[in-house]
Amino acid sequence: MNLHEYQGKQLFAEYGLPVSKGIACDTPKEAVAAADEIGGDGWVVKAQVHAGGRGKAGGVKLVKSKEEIREFAEKWLGKNLVTYQTDENGQPVSKILVESLTDIDQELYLGAVVDRGSRRIVFMASTEGGVEIEKVAEETPEKILKAEIDPLVGAQPYQGRELAFKLGLEGKQIGQFTKIFLGLAKLFEECDLALVEINPLVITPAGDLHCLDAKVGVDGNALYRQKKIHEMHDPSQEDSREAEAAKWELNYVALEGNIGCMVNGAGLAMGTMDIIKLSGGQPANFLDVGGGATKERVSEAFKIILSDDAVQAVLVNIFGGIVRCDMIAEGIIGAVKEVGVKVPVVVRLEGNNAELGTKVLAESGLNIIAATSLADAAEQVVKAAGGK
């Protein structure tokens, strides 16, 4: 689960990190009032969406008057912001962050992720702040400094100082950076984060370090014990189908093809998408109904898949292990009847009660195409969707 910048900065402040004074606003009137409360003669206004590249898309602006703030808020509130990280529809803007201006002498980068290879939290720092860290990693990987956090002892002050020295910091900046490093590590662990970035972490003309941006991603599997953070969830930033799928504990990711996929198991789902692609088709989604699929979840999965108008055929690929194929077959029949499926449905069943499941489908009287193998299923569904 991702957080908005203003929410991330609220957490930063709670953990002692230096952030700008800012107010998240819902209306142009609130945005103008926020400028009065913050004070000064210049501000930064930022559209709040779960995507990078806002500045290049016009979603971040330095303003010198309250009239400019009002115009910016009127331009973006209730509209969609399209950046290089969004799809062509963009993401809706429901809040504008109004912040005090911060003068910048230098931009740095500081972030942390869970490294699956080392099974540890890894901090990354770089002198190349203000640009995409992925670009830095690709073009000049030697400019990215790393520090692994030992899970037994946690982040240590010496690691912060070591990174600070390598970044070329000096004097009071060493202590400031170490404090930010330790605060960020504590936040990462206590709030079950999956990713956190400060880009840029700036040095002001006075020589102080300041967190100018906040990108925070929370481990969705830990939200049950992060009630406060869970309340920050903004479903408007997610694909509506993905949000609906999450309610039913379905793993759904929208894609851009025309062949809907319903599979049990993430690995089998990825393999199914691969073979559709190899057969000349384009998957419309990734959908894993899981090992504990029920008739109700299968029915909801169909509804979600068919809510995508681009879908011209559906492939159901089930390997019966924990879940019985005959139960899945009953769910498919119920869903086809309830939803009124108008597109071709190709079903491949293998494993637990596969023969019984195939028999149930055959006796249903519905227009469901039974496949004899995964390769056959892919060929059938591509053909049904109008492919080769």
Curated annotation (Swiss-Prot):
Pfam families: ATP-grasp_2 (PF08442), Ligase_CoA (PF00549). Its EC number is 6.2.1.5. Heterotetramer of two alpha and two beta subunits. ATP binds at residues 46, 53-55, 99, 102, 107. Mg(2+) binds at residues 199, 213. The lineage of its organism: Bacteria, Pseudomonadati, Pseudomonadota, Gammaproteobacteria, Pseudomonadales. The keyword Chaperone does not apply. It catalyses: succinate + ATP + CoA = succinyl-CoA + ADP + phosphate; GTP + succinate + CoA = succinyl-CoA + GDP + phosphate. Binds 1 Mg(2+) ion per subunit. It comes from the Bacteria. GO terms for molecular function: ATP binding; magnesium ion binding; succinate-CoA ligase (ADP-forming) activity; succinate-CoA ligase (GDP-forming) activity. InterPro entries: ATP-grasp, ATP-grasp_succ-CoA_synth-type, ATP_grasp_subdomain_1, Succ-CoA_synthase_bsu_CS, SUCC_ACL_C, Succ_CoA_ligase-like_bsu, Succinyl-CoA_synth-like. PROSITE patterns: ATP_GRASP, SUCCINYL_COA_LIG_3. This is Succinate--CoA ligase [ADP-forming] subunit beta. Succinyl-CoA synthetase functions in the citric acid cycle (TCA), coupling the hydrolysis of succinyl-CoA to the synthesis of either ATP or GTP and thus represents the only step of substrate-level phosphorylation in the TCA. The beta subunit provides nucleotide specificity of the enzyme and binds the substrate succinate, while the binding sites for coenzyme A and phosphate are found in the alpha subunit. GO terms for cellular component: cytosol; succinate-CoA ligase complex. Belongs to the succinate/malate CoA ligase beta subunit family.
